[in-house]
Amino acid sequence: MFASKPAKAYVFFLANPQPQNASSQDMETYPELMMQQVQSLSLILTREANDLTQAQCDVMLNGESTGILVPGHILEAAVQVNDQRYILFLTDDVIFEESLTIALIDVHDGLKEIVRLGNEYSTGSFADLQITDDSVNFRFIGDYIWTVEVSDSPRLHLPFISDPKGLKRESGLKKYIAISATPSPENIS
């Protein structure tokens, strides 16, 4: 009367299978990629700037389109954070009102976050890029050294409290990019 259904088979895969009695010396380790400046990224202009909006560009990785669109016209620098994430430092080449756009992109997940550094009628010049294992330092506006750190997962962002003056980001309670500004050593008396 009743047809029997075939038994279901379940297969489980462990993300990181490890022998239960293996010591840390037996385990193979892989070094993490340290932040580094790269030349493998470039931009292709998709929309010119106008009075109301920044220029927009498609991000190219090794000459291939990523499909990721970012605001800005000039790629000042690109820093590889890990095997799929990059920090882009972008400007629009606007005299007397230059601002810096910092974009975090993920080649698999697209644009993760954008922050902007600058104010009306202020000029800045991107300079002195220095990269450590977990941060990027540079100069842009004023006599400050700006430091950018990126987290793997979003962190709590408290609007109006946690960012230095001149930094703008979209409203929300999460961030991947943390930015701080410290007076440059030659200006401390």
PLM region descriptions:
Residues 96-103, 144-149:
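Structural motif
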